[in-house]
């Protein structure tokens, strides 16, 4: 999983945000995947936070989604 993090001021802040993003991405991925009979997008390739503060996950297929705090995707 490639995690993109911008705007942190300290190494500690970077590490905390990276750990949070990676854990949250795994949770969102598992939930999203559970709603498909056949998941065709592969594993997580890249994770980042967009300009509006939403977590974005790109999968091995190249497809990606935004996720809000409730776990909804679009």
Tell where the protein language model's regions lie, with residue ranges:
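Amphipathic, interaction-prone secondary-structure segments
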Residues: 37-71
């Amino acid at each position: 999983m490639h995690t993109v993090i911008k705007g942190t001021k300290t190494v500690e802040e970077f590490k905390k945000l990276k750990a949070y993003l990676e854990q949250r991405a795994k949770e969102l991925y598992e939930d999203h995947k559970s709603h498909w009979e056949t998941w065709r997008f592969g594993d997580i390739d890249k994770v980042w936070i967009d300009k509006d503060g939403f977590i974005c996950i790109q999968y091995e297929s190249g497809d990606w989604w935004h996720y809000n705090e409730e776990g909804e995707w679009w």
